[in-house]
């Protein structure tokens, strides 16, 4: 047996192996020690192998999912080896085989998965971009290939990007597990990835290294074509994504290995381009608290506020819409249209009518009826996957049957509103139950057992042989009562009993007082202290028949259930289309409910550059104020267009500058994803990215101070923001001297205004920056209001024109509970500093043009040009130490006038 275990373990050296032995899964040697540490289970030794004690630990079969869930949460992978041989016919150890490998990115079991989020598996690989390609910003630029798979949903995707965009992809995909080539074989890619990964802040994902040969582009293209049953990937827009094909090769190999079978539920491919999506860098996802708070919690976030979906698949789709907003506004317009129709259309109003047609005055909006109907639907998406993988449970199929039976009523609810909304009309077509699927599921018992091994899964009347075997088992009690009565009469033993237990089977029990009357045909089976147990030829014959019938009944039922699943697997495409329609309807109904409950309005898209928000609100802050019965939220306007590209925002801490900036970004994001928005009105022009530099945080793990993190993020924004980007800059320049910070803040504001020409909200405590608007016509000063009352301060949280008169830092310190002596000294010192500032010379003009040295006007000579060309071709973020040294030598040669 240990030889068999060691053979299996050799195939999975870095994975915990759960080795099935009867009613337990056993772990041996180092696996047992590790499981003991992680799960706090008992460790023991038994016998010897190769002269060493066999260290072992085990978990019960009936509770294995609980232990698997704990291990997955800790980032472990587990290979489950089941007994596949027949115990009764095996000579020697029963044959065992690994039937699945459970890893964080390949989960399919409902007990291991979170209902409302997806566990994505992502493969990454890089290569040097070809010279002259659009992706190569230098001769040594890296091009990244991505391939991802949602094992539980069948969602498969590929993409390519430059290193600067990789962080955004990691933030939007949020993988649970990452597949990478060995770092020692891809040094440059590994170095670049480590930097990007640290900045993305996604250290919770498990990193799994796969052999370098698995990242092969030709192999990946062939695997993708085989998986999708096509000759070319042209129809998916993925034919020319060679680096992504290499990632897909490793992804599909790993996925098929973990499932020990083909992935028949993976039937489509998405190949989004970074140019199709609004860019949301990791800092934006983090600072806007889209899916997690800054503390890493799931609530309160924008997603937690918005997610009132009735199904898990709806919640997962909502998360995807939120993190994948599209630049093309057509899809968002269709979603707005559907939400408006669900809000306006009364439930029960027939198609071809108008919303103003007479209806039941008590009728609720269509979205409420739709949400009520969705309560009776199950997670069709994940159930269809488990059907494809032959892992589905009886009660999941019962839920699928209930969903199909609810479709006619659900479709009738949608049809009326669908007349005026294209998305609703498309989904209504998918809400027609397939008669063959319903017929197949009709063989299922009305309330099947939770597990197939318990029996009672197939309905009576479906199979004559099964009914006959069940009848034998069901008539068992009647037979035993009849036999007991006959034997009492025949023997005259009044307390004789006929019983059954799992150890000894059927038996006749006679107490000591009646043993002298036991007939000769009674055969002794067991002796007890005060009784004897016997069996007769008649009882033995019945036992053989009954026990055989029970085993044969379970075997027959298992076979019938497997046939049912095989039949359902032929309708996988229809089930997946149904799942997509139900998920989309759930999200649209959720967004309609949120729009009505939170009093959100439909945004309007325009073609010219514009962010025009009337009475905008921060949705999460407003909701928290209402929950805590705090002060009413103060709405604020924001108007940015071709004439006003930048708002310079000043005012006190706690005044609401950051809240105002974040609410503008959230409103832009919500409108772009297809939701209504928390504002009285909203007009929005084209947007290609939302960049943020908000808050302060050290990155100790990567030896970066708060100021370094701030400058790194600001530099990325200056390099990437376009005239269609929205940029939030909050108090840039902190963490260094006032002079340095002020100079940097002024230079950054100038670059954003003159070079990037993006929409910018620039919050600052440097009062000197309020002069920026005097020198730059597209900049405007605004401030958050505050009123002093004696030594107290009242924050108005209102954005008003013009600069703030002061920052009120001392008053805020007093509100924070600072000792009175400290506040008093600070106030006196502040007065002295202000008087001294008034007596000094006028401050240097921060925004005057930089005077160029006289020599700079001259045309650079050939040596200077050679050095400049070499510098322009370098990519410092991707250079290895060796390559950096070689580049330095080339620069020195060029500076000395020799050939580079």
Describe each model-derived feature in a short phrase.
Residues 29-32, 241, 310, 321, ...:
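ATPase nucleotide-binding head domains, primarily ABC-like/P-loop NTPase cores
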Residues 389, 393, 403-406, 460-461, ...:
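Charged, surface-exposed helical/loop "interaction arms" that form contiguous linear patches used
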Residues 528, 532-566:
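Extended, charged coiled-coil "arm/hinge" scaffolds of SMC/Rad50-like chromosome-maintenance ATPases
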Residues 1-343, 347-351, 356-361, 375-388, ...:
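Charged catalytic and DNA/RNA-contacting regions of genome-maintenance
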Residues 864-900:
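C-terminal tails and terminal domains of large nucleic-acid-associated
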Residues 434-444, 506-522:
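Cytosolic, long alpha-helical scaffolding segments
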Residues 81, 104-113, 262, 481-493, ...:
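Active-site phosphate-binding and catalytic loops of NTP-dependent enzymes
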């Amino acid at each position: 047996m240990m030889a068999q275990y060691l053979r299996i373990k050799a195939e999975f050296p870095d994975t915990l192996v759960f080795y099935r032995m009867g009613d337990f899964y056993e772990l041996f040697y180092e696996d047992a020690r590790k499981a003991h540490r992680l799960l706090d289970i008992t460790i023991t030794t038994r016998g010897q192998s190769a002269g060493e004690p066999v260290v072992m630990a085990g978990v019960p079969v009936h509770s294995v999912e609980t232990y698997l869930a704990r291990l997955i949460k800790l980032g472990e992978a587990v290979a489950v080896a089941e007994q596949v041989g027949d115990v009764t016919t095996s000579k020697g150890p029963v044959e065992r085989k690994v039937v699945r490998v459970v890893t964080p990115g390949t989960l399919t079991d409902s007990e291991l998965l979170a209902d409302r989020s997806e566990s994505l598996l992502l493969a990454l690989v890089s290569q040097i971009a070809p010279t002259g390609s659009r992706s190569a910003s230098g001769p040594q630029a890296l091009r990244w290939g991505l391939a991802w798979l949602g094992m539980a949903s069948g969602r498969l995707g590929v993409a390519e990007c430059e290193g600067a965009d990789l962080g955004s992809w990691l933030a939007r995909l949020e993988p649970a597990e990452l597949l990478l080539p060995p770092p020692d074989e891809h040094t440059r890619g590994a170095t670049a990835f480590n930097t990007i990964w640290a900045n993305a802040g996604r250290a919770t994902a498990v990193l799994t290294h796969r052999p370098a040969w698995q990242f092969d582009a030709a192999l990946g293209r062939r695997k993708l074509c085989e998986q999708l049953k096509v000759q070319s990937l042209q129809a998916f827009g993925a034919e020319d994504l060679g680096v992504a094909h290499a990632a897909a090769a490793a992804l599909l190999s790993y996925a098929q290995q973990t499932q020990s079978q083909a992935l028949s539920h993976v039937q489509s491919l998405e190949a989004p381009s970074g140019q199709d999506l609004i860019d949301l860098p990791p800092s934006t996802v983090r600072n806007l608290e889209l899916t997690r708070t800054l503390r890493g919690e799931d609530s309160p976030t924008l997603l937690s506020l918005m997610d009132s979906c009735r199904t898990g698949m709806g919640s997962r789709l909502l998360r995807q819409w939120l993190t994948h907003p599209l630049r093309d506004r057509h899809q968002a317009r269709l979603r707005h249209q559907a939400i408006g129709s669900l809000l306006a259309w009364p439930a029960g109003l027939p198609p071809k009518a108008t919303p103003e047609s007479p209806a039941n005055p008590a009728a609720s909006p269509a979205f409420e009826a739709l949400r009520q109907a969705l309560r009776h639907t199950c997670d069709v998406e994940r159930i269809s996957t488990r059907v494809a993988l032959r892992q589905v449970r009886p009660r999941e199929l019962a839920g699928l049957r209930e969903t199909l039976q609810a479709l006619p009523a659900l479709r009738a609810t949608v049809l009326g509103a669908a007349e005026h909304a294209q998305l609703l009309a498309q989904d209504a077509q998918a809400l027609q139950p397939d008669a063959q699927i319903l017929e197949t599921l009709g063989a299922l018992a009305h309330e099947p057992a939770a597990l197939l091994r318990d029996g009672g899964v197939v309905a009576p009347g479906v199979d004559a042989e099964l009914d006959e075997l069940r009848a034998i088992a069901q008539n068992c009690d009647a037979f035993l009562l009849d036999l007991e009565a006959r034997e009492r009469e025949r023997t005259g033993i009044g307390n004789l009993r006929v019983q059954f237990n799992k150890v000894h089977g059927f038996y006749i029990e006679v107490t000591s007082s009646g043993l002298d009357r036991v007939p000769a045909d009674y055969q002794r089976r067991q002796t007890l202290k005060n009784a004897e147990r016997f069996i007769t030829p008649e009882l033995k014959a019945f036992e053989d028949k009954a026990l055989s019938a029970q085993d044969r009944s379970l075997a027959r039922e298992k076979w019938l259930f497997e046939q049912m699943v095989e039949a359902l697997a032929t309708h996988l495409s229809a089930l997946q289309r149904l799942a997509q329609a139900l998920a989309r309807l759930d999200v649209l109904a959720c967004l309609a409910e949120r729009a009505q409950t939170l009093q959100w309005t439909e945004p309007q898209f325009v073609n010219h550059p514009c962010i025009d928000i009337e009475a905008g609100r921060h949705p999460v802050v407003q909701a928290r104020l209402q929950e805590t019965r705090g002060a009413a939220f103060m709405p604020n306007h924001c108007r940015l267009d071709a004439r006003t590209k930048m708002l310079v925002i000043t005012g006190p801490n706690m005044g609401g500058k950051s809240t105002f900036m974040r609410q503008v970004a959230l409103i832009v994001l919500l409108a772009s994803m297809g939701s209504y928005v928390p504002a009285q009105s909203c007009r929005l022009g084209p947007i290609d990215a939302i960049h943020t530099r908000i808050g302060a945080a050290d990155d100790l793990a990567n030896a970066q101070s708060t100021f370094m993190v701030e400058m790194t993020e600001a530099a990325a924004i200056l390099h990437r923001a376009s005239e269609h980007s929205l940029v939030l800059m909050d108090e840039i320049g902190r963490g260094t001297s006032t002079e340095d910070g002020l100079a940097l803040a002024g230079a950054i504001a100038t670059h954003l205004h003159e070079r990037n020409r993006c929409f910018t909200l620039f919050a600052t405590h440097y009062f000197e920056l309020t002069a920026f608007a005097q020198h730059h016509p597209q900049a405007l000063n605004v401030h958050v209001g505050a009123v002093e009352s004696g030594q107290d301060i009242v924050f108005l949280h209102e954005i008003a024109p013009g600069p703030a008169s002061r920052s009120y830092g001392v008053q805020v310190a007093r509100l924070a509970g600072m000792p009175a002596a400290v506040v008093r000294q600070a106030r006196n010192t502040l007065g002295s500093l202000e008087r001294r500032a008034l007596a000094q010379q006028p401050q240097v003009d921060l925004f005057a043009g930089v005077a160029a040295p006289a020599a700079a006007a001259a045309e650079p000579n050939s040596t200077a040009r050679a050095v400049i060309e070499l510098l322009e071709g370098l990519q410092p973020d991707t250079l290895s130490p060796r390559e950096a040294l070689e580049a330095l030598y080339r620069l020195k040669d060029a500076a000395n006038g020799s050939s580079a």
